[in-house]
């Protein structure tokens, strides 16, 4: 059975723009290679917004060298980027953006959500790219709720959505650059779930709502449990109804050099990213 190496969380929220009050639950700045290929996870909300005249969100900003994965639980957001791609995602939908060689993008509450108001709840996960893929062309994947496999758990314990990777016979729709899994799980109170994950892969369990026993440890709302890579068996038991994410992936074992919105493999590549951005060499819409 997997052992918990550490439990991490953050009670303090900070604003990303004027639309996303987030708690950063983990980051490569503190966990480094231990969390690879994942870089960070921000949990936004749940937060209530009244109807508004002006749009809320975060304006155009750059990224290079990694991917952002946005999972919406409540509310609705719109995304536009410098490749001309974009879209609107609502409850259950996922936006998987590969910044790679460089992209400029903006994220706002949708016009519909802005005008009606409501509760916003979402996760944004950063996933590192192998150094060989960091300068690939950007890519945007819209994964609608209807296209994400839903699997009923044994003993009517709940439901697992396969966003990326494989669970049993079910393959998630996300195209990834390295072997990894992102599973969105609802586990009912008092129920148990056992998962077998690849030996040697990083494993983290993110609790968004509820309280969960992970092995011998209790993990609470807005906390992340980092587990060992040696034992493939992950044992979970819900103390009450729990919403959680299971993140698993093959470690990249490459240098992680980050500076704000850029994550590369060397300081020289960071300097080049800054120079390219400042000189308008990121992809721009025609």
From Swiss-Prot:
Binding site residues for a divalent metal cation: 61, 63, 105, 107
CDD domains listed in its UniProt record: cupin_pirin_C, cupin_pirin_N
Catalyzed reactions: quercetin + O2 = 2-(3,4-dihydroxybenzoyloxy)-4,6-dihydroxybenzoate + CO
EC number: 1.13.11.24
Cofactor names: a divalent metal cation
Pathway: Flavonoid metabolism; quercetin degradation
InterPro entries linked: Pirin, Pirin_C_dom, Pirin_N_dom, QDO-related, RmlC-like_jellyroll, RmlC_Cupin_sf
GO molecular function, one term: quercetin 2,3-dioxygenase activity
Domain of life: Bacteria
Pfam families: Pirin, Pirin_C
Keywords: Dioxygenase, Metal-binding, Oxidoreductase
Cysteines paired by S-S bonds: none
Cofactor detail note: Binds 1 divalent metal cation.
Reported function: Putative quercetin 2,3-dioxygenase.
Family: Belongs to the pirin family.
Protein name as it appears in the record: Putative quercetin 2,3-dioxygenase PA2418
Provenance organism: Pseudomonas aeruginosa (strain ATCC 15692 / DSM 22644 / CIP 104116 / JCM 14847 / LMG 12228 / 1C / PRS 101 / PAO1)
